[in-house]
């Protein structure tokens, strides 16, 4: 049975409302659970929003990885084995814990800065709680913090930019390309376009594609932005560091074409795209680093040694 107009519009509204508010996930895990020393740190975003994070030192190392996170998550991951986060994405009702990622990086010889994006974790709120359009300023703030801190200012920098964090990093490269001078490389799991995810949602519920106009109208009225303004493939044209993308191929939230377009639009030769096969769980893309880290450590080592 086809959905009614009212049902389609209500579903669109629920998606659009998430751009202005969601259930904040608590920080469930800390680096000391993996035997890692760490400092609680804070620094301003480029526009002044206070950001909270961890600095995880690796003694005698002159290399640092700056890590951010997907939407709904924070620097520690997400407790999606618990209510209400187990309802975010059907089939992804298992916890994602990012602390093992930081342990792998530390043991491979990297300092780590992991921070919460604005409106997530313990970081401050900005832009009336708006998601998706200003996190690029947080990326710039993290770079300024590392370059301004006495014990990290001369370190080689690599980026671990996950999902919304990848979107934000690509957007920052468009807005402030000069800020990435000297950044050695990036790994970027699962960037995602608003247009792709909304189109897939409409298709799965059997709604005509013409409802994209209604989705765009609702998004604009809620956020002052259009769907086309949240487009990693467009921002990828400004990517200026070696970039390793990876993505669950059968992710039901998007299409392979979206991430393929991000890859295709990166204008430099030093790029790579890895498809994760055998699963349709988006969250498996976020735990893939800790399951199969060697290829990513090789990428970092190639550009940071």
Residue map of PLM features:
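Short beta-strand/loop motif that positions the catalytic acidic residue
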Residues: 238-240, 245-247, 251
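N-terminal targeting or regulatory segments adjacent to alpha/beta-hydrolase or S9 domains
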Residues: 1-34
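C-terminal catalytic histidine-bearing segment of alpha/beta-hydrolase fold enzymes
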Residues: 260, 264-305
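Hydrolase active-site cap/lid region
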Residues: 171-225
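N-terminal cap/lid segment of alpha/beta-hydrolase-fold proteins
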Residues: 22-64
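Short alpha-helix in the alpha/beta-hydrolase fold that links the catalytic acid
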Residues: 241, 255-264
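Alpha/beta-hydrolase active-site loop
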Residues: 97-107, 117, 128-150
């Amino acid at each position: 049975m086809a959905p009614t107009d009212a049902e389609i519009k209500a579903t669109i509204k629920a998606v659009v409302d998430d751009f202005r508010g969601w259930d904040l996930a608590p920080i469930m895990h800390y680096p000391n659970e993996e035997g890692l020393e760490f400092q609680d740190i804070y620094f301003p975003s480029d526009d002044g929003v206070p950001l909270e994070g961890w600095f995880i030192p690796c003694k005698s190392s002159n290399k640092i990885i700056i890590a951010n996170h997907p939407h709904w998550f924070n620097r520690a991951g997400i407790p999606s084995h618990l209510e209400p986060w187990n309802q975010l994405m059907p089939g992804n009702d298992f916890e994602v814990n990012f602390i093992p990622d930081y342990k792998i990086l530390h043991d491979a010889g990297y300092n780590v800065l992991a921070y919460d994006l604005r409106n997530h974790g313990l970081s401050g709120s900005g832009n009336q709680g708006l998601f998706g359009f200003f996190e690029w300023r947080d990326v710039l703030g993290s770079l300024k913090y590392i370059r301004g801190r006495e014990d990290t200012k001369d370190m080689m920098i690599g980026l671990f930019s996950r999902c919304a964090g990848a979107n934000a990093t690509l957007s920052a490269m468009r807005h402030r390309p000069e800020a990435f001078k000297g950044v050695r490389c990036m790994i970027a799991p699962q960037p995602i376009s608003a247009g792709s995810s909304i189109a897939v949602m409409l298709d799965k519920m059997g709604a005509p594609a013409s409802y994209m106009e209604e989705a765009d109208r609702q998004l604009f009225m809620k956020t002052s932005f259009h769907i086309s303004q949240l487009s990693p493939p467009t921002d990828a044209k400004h990517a200026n560091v070696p970039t390793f993308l990876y993505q669950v191929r059968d992710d039901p939230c998007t299409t392979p074409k979206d991430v393929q377009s991000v890859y295709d639009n990166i204008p430099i030769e030093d790029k790579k795209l890895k498809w994760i096969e055998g699963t349709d769980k988006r969250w498996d893309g976020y735990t893939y680093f800790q399951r199969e880290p060697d290829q990513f450590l090789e990428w970092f080592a190639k550009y940071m040694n």
